[in-house]
């Protein structure tokens, strides 16, 4: 079985919380843009996202008072390097996690962080995991700030400092489901967690031990999965997505997941245009 078959995502460009994937657009927008959608080839488009981001369609929508930006944000996957090996930006990552937080209603999507989070203002270092669990921590979902109880937490960190341009993406996942809770660090290159992450994991462990009897920290780093120079972002997102879909962390320490798998996973992450 392919590793991608273990998760619930698909190459459709529609946001995953939509049940009808025949069209990503709301019925109102479909009706208003029928003529454009029927002749999308003449616009040089082969997808709905291409149509509604086309300058002519955007101009028409503005005249009609149609909010296409909301359609893109809530009914499509995030924009990003879908069909190439472009490096993922923090926007690609955060916008993807925001959309997953719509599908997974008990998932807390934390904005990205650089590795100097202990001395620079980042949400990652300010989160109280007990408040996350109890629904007392603010998170951004569907274009608004909400509070809701969450039993999973995910964040993608960069190993560079905030003064740099970025080096390598890694993932943090906190699982507060089941009997034994876990605080997990995943690095596709197989490197151990650095000091700031170790301290963060231990601090969160002590927070959670106040409300739950068994909490462990895990460094999922015994295999060097990544061989390329480009796929650390997809690997980090894939780890979070697989864990949300109840794929055990043990899967990542028992067999290598290839860069080719991540090339395919990009088509699950991002919309077409």
UniProtKB/Swiss-Prot annotation:
One of its GO terms (biological process) is symbiont-mediated suppression of host innate immune response. It comes from the Viruses. The active site is at 168, 187, 232 (nucleophile). Its main location: host cell. It is found in: Host cytoplasm; Virion. Gene3D superfamilies: Adenoviral Proteinase, Chain A. Substrate binds at residue 226. Keywords: Host cytoplasm, Host-virus interaction, Hydrolase, Inhibition of host innate immune response by virus, Late protein, Protease, Thiol protease, Viral immunoevasion, Virion. The keyword Hydrolase applies. Induction: Expressed late after infection. GO terms for molecular function: cysteine-type endopeptidase activity. InterPro entries: Papain-like_cys_pep_sf, Peptidase_C48_C, VPRT. Its EC number is 3.4.22.-. Coiled coil: none annotated. SUPFAM superfamilies: Cysteine proteinases (SSF54001). GO terms for cellular component: host cell cytoplasm; virion component. Belongs to the peptidase C63 family. Cysteine protease that plays several role during infection including processing of the structural polyprotein or inhibition of the host immune response. Catalyzes the maturation of the pp220 and pp62 polyprotein precursors into core-shell proteins. Plays a role in the disruption of host pyroptosis via specific cleavage of gasdermin D/GSDMD. In addition, strongly decreases the host cGAS-STING signaling by targeting IKBKE via its enzymatic activity. Also impairs host FOXJ1-mediated antiviral effect via degradation of FOXJ1. This is SUMO-1 cysteine protease S273R. It comes from African swine fever virus (isolate Tick/South Africa/Pretoriuskop Pr4/1996). The lineage of its organism: Viruses, Varidnaviria, Bamfordvirae, Nucleocytoviricota, Pokkesviricetes.
């Amino acid at each position: 079985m392919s590793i991608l078959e273990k998760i619930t995502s698909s190459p459709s460009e529609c946001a995953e919380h939509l049940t009808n994937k025949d069209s990503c657009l709301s019925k109102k927008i479909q009706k208003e843009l029928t003529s454009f959608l029927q002749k999308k080839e003449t616009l040089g488009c082969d997808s709905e996202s291409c149509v509604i981001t086309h300058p002519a369609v955007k101009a028409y929508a503005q005249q009609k008072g149609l909010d296409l930006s909301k359609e893109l944000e809530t009914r499509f996957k995030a924009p990003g390097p879908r069909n190439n090996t472009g490096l993922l930006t923090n926007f690609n990552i955060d916008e993807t996690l925001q959309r997953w937080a719509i599908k997974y209603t008990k998932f807390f999507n934390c904005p990205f962080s650089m590795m100097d989070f202990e001395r620079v203002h980042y949400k990652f270092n300010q989160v109280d995991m007990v408040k996350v669990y109890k629904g007392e921590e603010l998170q951004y979902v569907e274009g608004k700030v909400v509070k809701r109880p969450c039993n999973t937490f995910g964040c993608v960190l960069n190993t560079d400092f905030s003064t740099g341009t970025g080096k390598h993406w890694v993932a943090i996942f906190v699982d507060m489901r089941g009997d034994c809770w876990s605080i997990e660090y995943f690095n596709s290159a197989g490197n151990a967690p650095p000091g700031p992450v170790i301290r963060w994991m231990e601090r969160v462990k002590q927070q959670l031990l106040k409300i739950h009897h068994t909490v462990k920290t895990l460094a999922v780093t015994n295999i060097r999965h990544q061989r390329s120079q480009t796929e650390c972002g997809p690997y980090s997102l894939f780890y979070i997505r697989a864990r949300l879909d109840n794929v055990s962390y043990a899967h990542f320490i028992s067999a290598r997941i290839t860069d080719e798998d991540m090339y395919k996973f990009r088509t699950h992450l991002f919309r077409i245009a």
